[in-house]
Amino acid sequence: MKIVEVKHPLVKHKLGLMRAHDISTKRFRELASEVGSLLTYVATADMETEKVTIEGWCGPVEIDQIKGKKITVVPILRAGLGMMDGVLENLPSARISVVGVYRDENTLTPVPYFHKLVSSIDERMALVVDPMLATGGSMIATIDLLKKAGCPCIKVLVLVAAPEGIAALEKAHPDVELYTAAIDKGLNEKGYIMPGLGDAGDKIFGTK
């Protein structure tokens, strides 16, 4: 599995700000979107382009254009919504597919409860976005669903990943690509990433 820890200074700076215990909902939400945008820039660097001719101000001009059906953005509900605006800044025409998975707090196992995928998923690259890759269960369940629907290419964008989640994802889906702003130390006894960001969903939505 291709694993990319994006070490750009802007990414590291913004992620560092997100780790503050007293960060406001507004600021956390802004930074999640900004880091999501930067991760998207890196993750799409290998997209194929094709030459097309358009009418420019001085006559015909040849330009590069993204080839094919392009992309669907797949936020995992609910926390993935916090990164979606940043992704769409770079890909404003991307179609959106939504997957709902929550983690049972007692067993730490993923529980899928909703999905709505674009009809042309079998012709698109999927960018799956979720702030945290902890145990990997929710991400694996989402990718299982995408592959079952025929999605040919899947890339994962997360703010923070734990080694345990990376190992689980690589074992289940070695063909996907992972882009993360940080690989942290590991999980605590409750399955939270340490030092991590805390509960990203609660911080994005202001529910705690």
From Swiss-Prot:
Cofactor(s) in the UniProt record: Mg(2+)
Chemical reaction(s) catalysed: UMP + diphosphate = 5-phospho-alpha-D-ribose 1-diphosphate + uracil
GO biological process, one term: UMP salvage
Ligand binding (5-phospho-alpha-D-ribose 1-diphosphate): 78, 103, 130-138, 199
Cofactor note: Binds 1 Mg(2+) ion per subunit. The magnesium is bound as Mg-PRPP.
Molecular-function GO term, any one: uracil phosphoribosyltransferase activity
Superkingdom of origin: Bacteria
Binding residues for uracil: 193, 198-200
Entry-linked CDD domains: PRTases_typeI
E.C. no: 2.4.2.9
Pfam families reported for this sequence: UPRTase
Activity regulation description: Allosterically activated by GTP.
Keyword terms of this UniProt record: Allosteric enzyme, Glycosyltransferase, GTP-binding, Magnesium, Nucleotide-binding, Transferase
Class of this enzyme: transferase
Pathway given in the UniProt record: Pyrimidine metabolism; UMP biosynthesis via salvage pathway; UMP from uracil: step 1/1
Entry-linked InterPro entries: PRibTrfase_dom, PRTase-like, Upp_B, UPRTase/APRTase, Ura_phspho_trans
Cystine pairings recorded for this chain: none
HAMAP family: Upp_B
Family, similarity comment: Belongs to the UPRTase family.
PANTHER family assigned: ADENINE PHOSPHORIBOSYLTRANSFERASE (PTHR32315), URACIL PHOSPHORIBOSYLTRANSFERASE, CHLOROPLASTIC (PTHR32315:SF4)
Function, as annotated: Catalyzes the conversion of uracil and 5-phospho-alpha-D-ribose 1-diphosphate (PRPP) to UMP and diphosphate.
Name by which UniProt lists this protein: Uracil phosphoribosyltransferase
Organism of derivation: Sodalis glossinidius (strain morsitans)
Protein's gene: upp
